[in-house]
Every structure is written in C-alpha cells, then in structure tokens.
Amino acid sequence: MTPSEQNIDKEELAKFSDLAQDWWNPAGKMKPLHLINPVRLKYIEQQITLKGKHVLDVGCGGGLLSEALAKHGAIVTGVDMSESLIDVAKNHAEQQQLNINYQCQDIEILTKDAQRFDIITCMELLEHVPDPQRMIKNCAALIKPGGKLFFSTINRNFKAYLYTIVGAEYVFNLLPKGTHDYAQFIRPSELTQWAESGGLRLLDITGIHYHPLKNEFDLSRDVSVNYLACFTHE
C-alpha cells in the first residue's frame, strides 16, 4: 500500500508525533487524555469482561488505554502509524513490565492476517483520519463474531464546537491549539450509519461529560459533545 492510499492525514500524524515525549506526563499537553482514560476503561468494562480477551487498540498512541486494558487482564495489541508514539508506548510498557504487542502498522494491513479480536477499541481517532467510514469498515473486518467494538469521538454541533475547540483549546488551554477540526467531528447518526454499513449492530451510545470545577470526566446520558459507542458483529 502506497502512502497516498493510506487512510492517514500526514499533518495530523506529525502533530501527535510531536507530542510523543510528553504523552505520559499527566500534567502535560496530554492531560485531558489522562483524565478521560479511566472513563473509557469504565465504559468498556460495563459492556464486556476484559480478562483473557484479545484486544486490538487502534490508534493506540503512547499506550494509555493499551496499558489500562492489559492491567485488567486483556491480551493487547496496539497499533499506531506514528513510529515515535509506538517507541514511547514500547518503552513505557517495558518499564511497567507489561507484555503488550505494539506495532507501527496500518490497520488495513492487519485485515490481511488471520488473527481476529474479541474486542477492538478505536478511541479519539475517527475525527483525525481522512475517511472515518473506511476506518470503521477495517475495524469491523478484524472483529470476531460476537465481539465488541468501541469508538469514541466528538459530536458535530455548536455546543461541541464551543466546548472542545473554543473552551478546551483557547479558554482553558486543556489541549494544544489546533488539536481538532470541527469539520471532522461526527454525529452519532453518522457513526451508526457507517458502522451498520460495515455489518455492525449498535448496542449502546453514552456521553462523556467534563466537570470543570472538579477537573474530571464522567459518563453521561448527554451525547452532545464527547461520546462513546459500543457495537457488535454478529
């Protein structure tokens, strides 16, 4: 597969690669990801037991979610297109004495292999790739029958724009400026339609709410900004 055929945005890839050395700093530029990670794990564990399950973490970055999944008994493979992030993930997992299979790999290459997974996570990635529907389709091709896929992304509406771009990037400086592109945000109806076209069935959609006074995230019935979705392949 040539670089022009890959489902990656080179500017997005470079932007997150530049954050690699700060990835595991809970007070650094990736602080929101550190705050949201326990909420992602909580949601996944509400839907399925992790112990002994083979998990593919797509767009694993520096390994925040991959490590959390491994510590809860999952057998984890983490893939990302950023070599610098995969290096950070490998080094940190080694320090923690965790056995995680990290690969700097395009997910489409994995679809040609025989291995299929019980669980696939694709968190905060869809809004950063040129073709999110293609990403969902490839995830669907890698799940076992009856397995569960988890996506998290950002709704596309005025409130989401105010919260995630104006608020998070410019007012509270929770994220580096330019982290998000509003045009790439995804409505739940769009995510569901793309997933169903790939043979998936929606099980649940749950919102993620930020409490500024507590400086923490939690699950919510409000999906107007950040949200998580769980699908299955039957």
From Swiss-Prot:
Entry EC no(s): 2.1.1.222, 2.1.1.64
Molecular functions (GO terms): 2-polyprenyl-6-hydroxyphenol methylase activity; 3-demethylubiquinol 3-O-methyltransferase activity; polyprenyldihydroxybenzoate methyltransferase activity
One GO BP: methylation
Keyword Lipid biosynthesis found: no
Classification via Pfam families: Methyltransf_23
Record has Transmembrane helix as a keyword: no
UniProt keywords, alphabetically: Methyltransferase, S-adenosyl-L-methionine, Transferase, Ubiquinone biosynthesis
Reactions catalysed: a 3-demethylubiquinol + S-adenosyl-L-methionine = a ubiquinol + S-adenosyl-L-homocysteine + H(+); a 3-(all-trans-polyprenyl)benzene-1,2-diol + S-adenosyl-L-methionine = a 2-methoxy-6-(all-trans-polyprenyl)phenol + S-adenosyl-L-homocysteine + H(+)
Xref: CDD domains: AdoMet_MTases
Recorded metabolic or biological pathway in which this protein acts: Cofactor biosynthesis; ubiquinone biosynthesis
Residues reported to bind S-adenosyl-L-methionine: 40, 59, 80, 123
Known function: O-methyltransferase that catalyzes the 2 O-methylation steps in the ubiquinone biosynthetic pathway.
Family, per entry: Belongs to the methyltransferase superfamily. UbiG/COQ3 family.
NCBIfam families in alphabetical order: UbiG (TIGR01983)
Protein's recorded name: Ubiquinone biosynthesis O-methyltransferase
Organism: Coxiella burnetii (strain CbuK_Q154)
Gene name for this UniProt entry: ubiG
